[in-house]
Amino acid sequence: MSVVLPALDEEATVGGVVAAVRPLLGTLVDEIVVVDSGSTDATAARAREAGARVVRRDAVLPDVPVRPGKGEVLWRSLAATSGDLVVFLDSDLVDLGPDFVVNLLGPLLTVDGVALVKGFYHRPLRLPSSGMADTDAALTGGGRVTELTARPALAALRPELAGVVQPLGGEYAATRELLESLPFAAGYGVEIGLLLDTHTTRGLDAIAQVDLGVRKHRHRSLRALGATAAEVLDAVLRRCVPGHPGADPLTQFVPVDGDWLPDEQAVATADRPPLATQRATGS
């Protein structure tokens, strides 16, 4: 069984995540792999010190040109690992224990037909400007992109998945057989893309959820979340609306000297093919 942590400039937290999982090495877990997507800080060193194997994103499938985004890192991680089961954990988690991994694996090991297990949790997000909790996240169970983009999109276009508490959560487990059979959406659309594609190809009974208790993580700016929401929405539309052409760059506006100036951000939209297809065709 493989535990995968995608990481980009997470030197403050990645070592703690690896250390939390390390007690399971040699028993339930065969390998802990941190896939570094170009960190400029000490992420790789901290991960190695904590006991993980670190691979660079561009060192995996080196003949395939690298694209930006989280989905790219997770897709390449399949080629860098070997476990029949794969657990994905975000690298910015704080105060987690090995029970995260144990609980995510439970349904895969005990329930016939389950191929994807999504974690859900309470999110006591601290707002850095005030030190106060994000009460919206506490009351709804999801973050801002989940509540304002993902959940309404699923309700409108795939209501069978409306019961998924954390459709965008970065803590989940799946069989390698499933993961290598599915395309990986680019960027932050990867989690909802895998959820939708699992439902399409395997049905609702292939998806399980587990309560992981509390998830503490870093805060991201509203502007950054706008680009995340665009990638999530594009992944949904590509899978639920035939003929959807893909997203254009996202135009946001920033205040400069009393004026509002447009600022375009690229939206990662191109799916990677199933890894099984990539291996078979080499393209």
Positions of PLM-derived features:
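N-proximal low-complexity "stem/linker" segments adjacent to membrane-targeting elements
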Residues: 1-20
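Cell-envelope/extracellular polymer assembly enzymes that use nucleotide-activated donors
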Residues: 1-2, 31, 193, 198
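A conserved acidic beta->alpha catalytic loop
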Residues: 36-45
